[in-house]
Amino acid sequence: MTLSFEILEKDIAGRIGKLSGQGKIVKTPTLLPVINPHLNLIPPKEMQEMGVEAVITNAYIFSRSEEYRERALTDGLAKTLDFDGVIMTDSGSFQLSVYGEVEITNAQTIAFQQAIKSDIIVPLDIPTHPDSPREQVEQELSVTMDRIMEAKDIADHEHHTLAGPVQGGLFPDLREETGRRLSEAGFRFCPIGAVVPLMESYRYAELVKVVMAAKRGLSPAVCVHLFGAGHPSMFALAVAMGCDLFDSAAYALYAKDGRYMTTHGSYHLNELSYLPCPCPVCVGHTAKELNESPDRERLLAMHNLRVSLAEINRVRQAIRDGVLWELVDERCRSHPALLRGYRTLLGYNEELTALDRETKRRFFYRGDESCKRTEVVRYHQMVGRLTAGERTLISFSRHIKKKQTEEYDSVFYFKPPFGPFPAELTETFPIGQSEIPDFDEEMIKTGCIGIARLMETNPDSHFTIRCRPVWKDLITQILPTVEVQDEGS
C-alpha cells in the first residue's frame, strides 16, 4: 500500500493533512504510540478506541521473538496486534543505536517487514549520534543512503510505503542534502532520525536546526516523521517546523518510572497532591490512590497517552484557527530549553513566512518573541508596496484632529510591531485583528523596521513622526533622517 499525503490546512510550517491508502486514513499531525508486544500496557485495540489511528512497532523484536514471529508471518501485524489502522515498523535501527549492532541485514529486514504486512516499512539506517565527528557522520550517512536505495530497488511499492530516513548528525548541510536526494528519488514519507539524544538532553535549539535543515531539502509534499518525539510539551514546536508525525514509547516509559505527563512538563506521581487533568484516570482517582494502586503503571500510561492525544488535537485546532504561534509561545515558556528552541525557530522567520498563510484569526502580542513572528515579517514585506505622499505624517496616536493633518499629503497610523498603516487597512489582518499591550521598546524598534521599509520605497517623501515624548530619542536613534514631533504639537 502506497499512502498518499494530502495537505488540508496550514499555519506557519505546520499542516493538517491526511495520509490515506486502501481504506486506511490517518489525520495529521498525529502521534504513533510505540507497541512492544511483550510489554503491552495498553492493547492497540484499546488505543484505537481512544482515537489512535496509527501505531509503530519494532520489526526486529518480532523477528527475534519466539512467541510472535510465526504469528506475525502467518497472520500479519494487523491481526496479531488486533489493530486495523496504519501500522509502521522500525527496522532495528533503534537497537542499533542502543547496542551498536543487530543480527539482521537491510535486505532481510525489508523482506521481513513486507512479510508481516507492515504498511510503512523502514530501511536499516544508521542512527549516528548527534555528537559524532563529521567524518564518522559522512561515512555512516553514505552507508545509510546505500541501504535506502537498495530498499527502494527491492521493496514492494504497491503494498507498502517505504520510508526514507533523513540522517546527517548536527551538520545542516548534510541533513539538507540528504532531504534533497530523498525527495529527488521519489520518497514521500521521510522520518528525521537520530534526534532522540537531543530531546533527552533538552537540546531543543539544536533540534530546531536539524529539522529546519532537513525540511529545507525535502519537498513540501513529503510527510515528515520526527523519530522518537513523544512529550506533549514539544508537539507544538515540532509541528510549527513542519513535522507531521511523531512516535514514542514515552507514555509507557514514563509510567514505568512513575512519571505523570502534562503539556508543560512531567511530575513524579509521589510529588503530586492533586491531579490536574480531567481524563477518566484522574477523575476516578486521587493522587494518593493512583500512586498506591496495584495497577499504577497501566493507569499512568493511560493518562500519559490521553494527555498526548489531547495535545495533538489542540495543535490541530491551533493550525485551523491560525494561532499556532501562540500555542508554541505558551508551551515553550514551560522550560528554558524549549524557549531557546522557540527563539531559534524564530531565526528562520524569513523561510517560515514563505510557507505561512497570509491571513489569520488573530495576532496576540505575548512578548519580545512576537516581534519576530511570520505575520510581522510579511507585513514588513508588504508595507513597501504602499505609496506615501510628498509630505507624510506617521502618527502613533489614532486620535488626531483634522487640522493637524492638513499640511500632509498622506497620513499613516502606527501599530507596533507591524509599523505604519493607512486608515484603509484598519480592519484588515493583521492590523485589525491584533491585540497588543502598552507600547514597549522592543515592539517600537520592530515597528520602526516597517517605517524604514516605507521610507526606502518612497525616497522622495518627507516623513514626520508624531509620538509621545518618551519615544522621541529612540525613534531619532533608529531613524535619524526623520522629523520627530511630540503628540499634540
Curated annotation (Swiss-Prot):
GO process annotations (BP): tRNA wobble guanine modification
Enzyme Commission number: 2.4.2.48
Positions contributing to substrate binding: 125, 194
Main EC class the enzyme belongs to: transferase
Keywords from the UniProt entry: Glycosyltransferase, Metal-binding, Transferase, tRNA processing, Zinc
UniProt-recorded Gene Ontology molecular function terms: pentosyltransferase activity; zinc ion binding
Note describing how the cofactor binds: Binds 1 zinc ion per subunit.
Annotated residues for binding of Zn(2+): 277, 279, 282
Known pathway: tRNA modification; archaeosine-tRNA biosynthesis
GO-annotated cellular components: cytoplasm
Catalysed reactions listed for this entry: guanosine(15) in tRNA + 7-cyano-7-deazaguanine = 7-cyano-7-carbaguanosine(15) in tRNA + guanine
Cofactor: Zn(2+)
Keyword Transport on entry: no
Active site as annotated: 90 (nucleophile)
Pfam families: TGT (PF01702)
NCBIfam families linked to this entry: arcsn_tRNA_tgt, tgt_general
Family: Belongs to the archaeosine tRNA-ribosyltransferase family.
Known role: Exchanges the guanine residue with 7-cyano-7-deazaguanine (preQ0) at position 15 in the dihydrouridine loop (D-loop) of archaeal tRNAs.
PANTHER family on file: QUEUINE TRNA-RIBOSYLTRANSFERASE
Protein name, as recorded: tRNA-guanine(15) transglycosylase
Originating organism: Methanospirillum hungatei JF-1 (strain ATCC 27890 / DSM 864 / NBRC 100397 / JF-1)
Gene for this chain: tgtA
